[in-house]
Each structure stands twice: as structure tokens, then as C-alpha cells.
């Protein structure tokens, strides 16, 4: 697959992304040997003085965002690498909560292309190296890496984390990570390091996580054992070995993820004031995570795509003050647990608007309908969303969920509507 015409530092980002997508024989190729060799050549294995690495089935993005928000409130210069993106590739790398220009990414890709020689890299490995290179150039205090898939063999794990975080463990990506929570837990705990904090937000922790912590000599900090949180009427309380923080502001991200981020921050030893914690928690929001875009009708975007996330989403919907119906625009990938995910939502959704997702992994609208037995079929996510918005009364809620791709399509349709495009 080599010898395609190689883009240059000044080539458009789209040309580079097309090149990267076709560079390696496999889309996913787990293992650290190839990517670590290139990282060593680029000298990016220590992208900042302090690194957090965040793994987990759900909640990684909002945990990273909370860490970023609090650390910035405390005066640190912070970089975050996350995936997948919703609308633009540049979302994947944030420096001080801002995306970098496309030209920065293409310059970085050119550096990696020059350094890799004959070593073949996947799209994700290339992107990870690029993020590390960009962070190194930015001279940051802290870098936060969101694991792409699993942990042990994920490209992010070539970097030694000063604090490792596992947010939650549920069944997803079983083809790659194993058939049960124990196998998945072992893979995710692969990011742990000797004598470093390993913070686990999953309340029902598989024993394999403790096994790996013991094998590696990591300092395991478990929710409900070493730290905990409790939601009160108008705030919440966090407690760990260092003491308690009372009357914290309720976060806009899921509560367990804000608490897990706080546990990781307090385990890090980084100087962070209580005021920075309060300010950072309040300002942390992330697109596509129970994102309320508008009211009358209320429009909510959520990337929930497995039963664990869908159950949380259903609970959030039940807690909203509402009098009208919930109209759900749904599109999913066929390798997800479609039946289990939809079953978690059925009690809170009144009408389903089923749409296909394109590409080899996309489920058809008909496949979704097989599980639901009711609803309407549309030819695209945008068409389903337009139909739901047209049907919605001011008191209703339109929910868009099922995949990052589904939410991205609606965001793009909203942008097109604002700019008068198609």
C-alpha cells in the first residue's frame, strides 16, 4: 500500500487523511512495537512533564474534559488528545481547550512521514504520534491522553502515564478486547504503571484490574473503597484519603466521570486549589454528551452507543422536567449491541426515527426496526432528524443518539441550516 503520492507539509488536511486511511493493510493493528519505534525517532515519548492516560468503556471524553477544565482553572498549560472526532479531525487535539489550525496538523504529519521510514502505521497510530509531536512543540505542563481502544496495546500506551484512569467497564469491542468484563478489564488496566496511581471509577470492578495492578505494582485507588462521592440536594461531596470536599457544584458532565476526574487529580500530587476544582467542574462540557442544543422543542445530542451508556442516558431523560413526548432519532453501527442498547431506551422513547449509517460498519434502518418493532424508516440521519423536528411540539424532546456518526450528521445538518446550505 506504500508509494501512493505522499502529501507535503503544505498539502490540505483532507489529502493527508485520505493518505493515512489507505497507508496500512489493517484499520486496527494492536501492538506497540511499530509505533513506539517511530515515537522514539521523533522523541515524543515524554510529551509533557506530567501525563494522565484515561481508558474505559464509557465516560473517557468527559473525564478528560473535566481534568482539562480543572487543570486550566489552576493555571496549568494543558493538551488533550481524544477520539473519535464528531465533525472535524482537528477536534482530536486540543491545546488550552482550543483546536489547532489544519496547517499545524499537516506539518506534524509531514514530520512523522519523514521519521517513519519503512515502518507502516495505522490511521490511529499516525494521529497519536501527531498529537504527541504537537504537544511537545507547545511546551505544555500536562498532557491528557484518551485511549482509543482497550489500553494495553493501544498506541497511547507507548507513553508512560503518571496517573492512569479507568472510567468504566462494560461490554463493547468484544472482538478486540475479549468476551467478558474480566477480559476487558485486563486490557484496560494495561495502562497502569509501577508505583503510579491507578484510579478506577467503575463501582463493580472486575478482579482482573486488581490482578494487573498487583502484577505491575501500581497504586490502585478504587471508587467506593479508596475514594467516593455522594450527590446531595444542590451539590455533591467527594472524599478520599486526603479528606472531603463538600458542596461541590453539580457538573454538566455525568456525575461519576466528574468524580473520577477529581480522584485522579487529587492522586496526581499536582497543586490544584479548591477554587480551581469548583470553577473547573462547573465549566466542563463536551459536545455530544447529553448536549441540550435548544428548547421548545428540546433537542438533545448524545453519542451513547452501548447498553451501559444507553441506561445512563435513559436515567438522565427520566430526571428532566418534561410534559411532552420523546422522539428519538437513532442510527447505529451493526457491530454494536443494538438490541441491548435499544432495550435500555424503550421505556423513555415514545417514537423512533430510524436511519442508516453509511460504510461497511453501518446498520440499516431496517436492522434497527427489527429490534424495535415500531417506528419509521428514513433514508438518512438528516432526513430522520428533520422529520422528528417537524413532528415535535414545543413541549416535546427530540433525542439524537446511537453513535458518534449519528450525532455528527445532525451537527452537520444544523450547520448547513444556519449557513443556508443543503
Where are the language model's segments positioned?
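ATP-dependent carboxylate-amine ligase catalytic core
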Residues: 7-8, 12, 26-28, 32-49, ...
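Nucleotide phosphate-binding/pyrophosphate-handling subdomain across enzymes
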Residues: 48-50, 137, 142-147, 154-165, ...
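A conserved segment at the C-terminal end of the G1
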Residues: 50-54, 62-79
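Beta-strand->loop->alpha-helix junctions that form or flank phosphate-binding loops
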Residues: 81-84, 200-202, 214-231, 248-252, ...
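Extended acidic/charged loop-beta regions that coordinate divalent cations
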Residues: 84, 88, 127-176, 207-244
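Membrane-proximal helix-turn-helix segments that form the acceptor-binding/catalytic region
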Residues: 185-194
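C-terminal helical cap/extension that packs against the catalytic core
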Residues: 199, 203-217, 232-235, 266, ...
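Active-site-proximal loop/hinge segments that shape catalytic or ion-binding/gating pockets
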Residues: 403
